[in-house]
Amino acid sequence: MAKPTAPSTPRPWSGRFAGSLHPRIARFNASIGFDIRLLPYDVAGSLAHVQMLGACGILSREEAEQIRQGLEQIEKEVAEGIFQPDPEAEDVHYAVERRLVALVGEVGKKLHTGRSRNDQVATDLRLYLRDEIDTIRQALWELRGVLLDLASQHVETILPGYTHLQRAQPISLAHHLLAYEEMLWRDWQRLGRVREEVNVCPLGSGALAGTSLPIDRQLVAHLLGFERISANSLDAVSDRDYLVEFHAAASLILVHLSRLSEELILWATQEFGFVALTDACATGSSLMPQKKNPDVLELVRGKTGRVFGHLQALLVTLKGLPLAYNKDLQEDKEGLFDTVDTVKACLEAMTILLREGIQFQTQRMEAAVQEDFSNATDVADYLVRKGIPFRAAHDLVGQIVRTCVAEGILLKDLPLERWKSFHRAFEEDIFAAIDPRQVVAARLSAGGTGFAVVREALQRAQARYQQTEPAEEPPLPPSSPGSGLPLES
């Protein structure tokens, strides 16, 4: 019988195995190619962990200090961009450990005392996502600011409002822009709620059942800036709800950016002509020399699908997993990283485009309002104010519009005698009532498009914007004994 051969490359679990892992299986199994992005967070988590091990007497002060110095050297290498993971390391955790052992010797192998890669990666992911949420919220804040600046310039610019992509009623352009600011404000708030769910420390949960060593999880959570510690070790290592919530929040951000992109694409067509693209944010055709294409907007619209896909992929991955950790969860990272990158890129591109890439064609917008029947509702409202039931008024105005369409004229072209032939309630003041600018100004109900109401809404939005200006992130709490952080409730 052949004698078993020892593994050629020691792995963090190789003691159980007599033979070597097939090299292609090793490559298939490895995640170092993408989870290296978690490197600074893995080092930060390890620094907090070793400080706790020393404070609890699980490691001697000398051992903890040696490991700390080694980790700080790795941290420096990461910051300088010179850290090179061992090519044999299967993941970011083992890459850090192998470098640590190379720096400080065998004592480095004590770093993993009292933890598992299961709670380690869960901690890394939460630290990473917490930072990225802050970055995305900052980008949302900046885009909201651009929308508010544009809205402040166009309170009294009017254009057709649409339902079913058919002209419906005239509105203020600022009102339209503020609608998108409202969407992004909700996105900003939503990500704040997701951050609260992310800000829970799972470190110390072990592989699934905790540890018999006298660790201090509250100290680790305090050092890493977490609000609380997880309550159940099984749940802590297998929970990816917060990733689903982030993907869902990211998907809604892209829904809103995609809707805005679609409208601007339409507005930039010759058929609409409401927007002109500047050279800074448009591209051309390799064949047709006259073209000026809205590629930035089309890419934002197109990238939305991949973000939706990552949400669906994660849900499908999670739906059949028994407790606790399963290797399937390795698949949670690439989609997350891509979603983070995509959302940030789209927010940046849209901010630049709205600031530098479009010019509103206000004369064309206002001319369009003069060319349609979007003031028909105001004729019905006029009759209602004269005491005529709305349904009767609605029916009558429909007949008037039908007559005008048949004759190729607009409501403003009807002389007063023709108005009176439809109903004796019409007087000279009907012409003021159907003037598009007056139509918009009259919409004074709360949340409406009336100029006065829009100015008030803009002031509220600007005040809200200033109140939510992102502050510089505070440093992590100083080293201290356990702070009595509560369990997750």
Swiss-Prot record:
Its main location: cytoplasm. Keywords: Amino-acid biosynthesis, Arginine biosynthesis, Cytoplasm, Lyase. InterPro entries: Arg_succ_lyase_C, Argininosuccinate_lyase, Fumarase/histidase_N, Fumarate_lyase_CS, Fumarate_lyase_fam, Fumarate_lyase_N, L-Aspartase-like. GO terms for biological process: arginine biosynthetic process via ornithine; L-arginine biosynthetic process. Pathway: Amino-acid biosynthesis; L-arginine biosynthesis; L-arginine from L-ornithine and carbamoyl phosphate: step 3/3. Its EC number is 4.3.2.1. It is found in: Cytoplasm. One of its GO terms (molecular function) is argininosuccinate lyase activity. Pfam families: ASL_C2, Lyase_1. GO terms for cellular component: cytosol. Belongs to the lyase 1 family. Argininosuccinate lyase subfamily. HAMAP family: Arg_succ_lyase. NCBIfam families: argH (TIGR00838). This is Argininosuccinate lyase. It comes from Synechococcus sp. (strain JA-3-3Ab) (Cyanobacteria bacterium Yellowstone A-Prime).
